[in-house]
Amino acid sequence: MSLTIAVAGKGGTGKTTLSALMIRCLRERGLTPILAVDADPNANLGEALDLSADLSIGQLQSETLKQVHSLPAGVPLSRHLEYELHQAIVEGEEVDLLMMGHGEGPGCYCAVNHILRRYLESLRSSYRCTILDNEAGMEHLSRRVSHGIDLLVIVSDASPTALRSAGRIAGIADDLELEIRRRCLVLTNLRGELSDRAIAELEKTGLEVVGRIPFDQEVAELRLADRPIDDLSSEAVSLTEVSEMLDRLLQKEEAA
């Protein structure tokens, strides 16, 4: 069984940290290989995983659009692009990274988009788990992954602003008509109880809260030191909470 989890949230809420923590927990459970897809133009998932990508899908698309009419005779566009796409995958130990980069501009080419979507959907089937770290607008999710999303995890901190954004993200997912089997909310960087305003905004989202992750000083220090998530101690409070949350989610997936 292949599992695809998409993570989305307002910038600064900790969605990339959550994605990296989930990847670590999945790897520790032996649910490998894992494909980590950084679909946020402000890409930093690779840094959290200690993987470095020099080439993004956005860059490949731009280059292909420039070359599409000058390919050698007898070389199909699909073969050329799929070869280049394979070069963009950064292979790690049990975890591979693919960076989406910036979305296409006005030079959009439908044949290229079709090949990209087909390739990415085929690629996911080669992995036990795929984690998609998305930007709030989920542009890449809508353009590149049309189906097969098992779980959409929307991330928010305790601020009313972030919770309103979480509700809007859920609405965007509806508007895009994405095939998502289940969606939920994870609260991050918690320091005590939610305010009355935050509770009101939370209720408006209509989302099930599946995780409440407290502020973790060790994670904060890790980020300041520019160190990967694997350097986090096994006793870290955030890792413990994400591990327990993931167990609950996986149990529900198995029962579905």
Region roles according to the model:
Residues 3-41:
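Walker A/P-loop phosphate-binding motif and the immediately C-terminal alpha-helix
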Residues 28-91:
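N-terminal phosphate/diphosphate-binding loop that engages ATP/GTP or pyrophosphate donors
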Residues 225-236:
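C-terminal boundary of histidine-terminating zinc-finger modules
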Residues 79-87, 91-92, 96-132:
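Cytosolic-facing regulatory segments adjacent to core modules
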Residues 21, 25, 48, 144:
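Active-site signature of alpha/beta-hydrolase-fold catalytic machinery across serine-
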Residues 111-212, 221:
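Conserved catalytic-core segment of NTP-binding enzymes
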Residues 58-59, 210-216:
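Beta-strand->loop->alpha-helix junctions that form or flank phosphate-binding loops
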Residues 51-55, 172-173, 200-204, 228-230:
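Short, hinge-like loop/turn segments at secondary-structure boundaries
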